[in-house]
């Protein structure tokens, strides 16, 4: 064999030429993560505009409460004053001059997102101003006052027991049909299921987080 002759091609020696992998697009953030990022950026902007200037390291629970009160100007929830004729009515029959405020549920969700964003940005749980006791007390006061003013009680929903207590020796309803379906390989998709209930938090707009 002539050593000066052409050698085997790289394609033949190593198989098919390597193809550069296309860059993967960045993973799309979930709705929660996107909202958390917007809320965090809004809070940082609030600190930059604060007078006197305020840094995140010096931020306390009192500053967080001040921020929540600042957000009231962007609220969309009518909160009746104690002297209003519609005070305590969940469905007032007409308009009134009472101001719009941030709903308690929106503020509560906002604080939860900011509390998580603070620690994700390097803060420690011990120094987290969004987890301060003063903030929890403030949110509780907002909840109670809005419940009275709007006539809408805020109560924790108790999970209903999936099955009522059955007498001894009595088979729960539906178990025989489920067993028959399992034995015969039948389609169980047509069976009744519990409907899931979701509660959507209203979103905000403009320069403030979606806490309205």
Swiss-Prot record:
Domain ALOG: 31-158
Source organism superkingdom: Eukaryota
Biased composition range(s): Low complexity: 1-22, 173-182
Pfam families, per the entry: ALOG_dom
Record key words, sorted: Developmental protein, DNA-binding, Nucleus, Transcription, Transcription regulation
Family, similarity comment: Belongs to the plant homeotic and developmental regulators ALOG protein family.
Physiological role: Probable transcription regulator that acts as a developmental regulator by promoting cell growth in response to light.
Name the UniProt record assigns to this protein: Protein G1-like7
């Amino acid at each position: 064999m002539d050593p000066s002759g052409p050698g085997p091609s790289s394609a033949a020696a190593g198989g098919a030429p390597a193809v550069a992998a296309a860059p993967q697009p960045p993973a799309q953030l979930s709705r929660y993560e996107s909202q958390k990022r917007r809320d965090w950026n809004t809070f940082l902007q609030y600190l930059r505009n604060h007078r006197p200037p305020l840094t995140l390291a010096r931020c306390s629970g009192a500053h967080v409460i001040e921020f929540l009160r600042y957000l009231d100007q962007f609220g969309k929830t009518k909160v009746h004053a104690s002297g209003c004729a519609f005070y305590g009515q969940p469905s007032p029959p007409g308009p009134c001059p009472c101001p719009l405020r941030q709903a308690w549920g929106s503020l509560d969700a906002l604080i939860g997102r900011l509390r998580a964003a603070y620690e994700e940005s390097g803060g420690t749980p011990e120094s987290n101003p969004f987890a301060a006791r003063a903030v929890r007390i403030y949110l509780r006061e907002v909840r109670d006052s809005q419940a009275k003013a709007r006539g809408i009680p805020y109560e924790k929903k108790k999970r209903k027991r999936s099955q009522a207590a059955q007498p001894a020796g009595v088979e729960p309803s539906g178990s025989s049909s489920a067993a028959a379906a399992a034995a015969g390989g039948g389609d169980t998709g047509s069976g009744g299921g519990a409907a899931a209930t979701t509660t959507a938090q209203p979103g905000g707009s403009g320069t403030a987080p979606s806490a309205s």
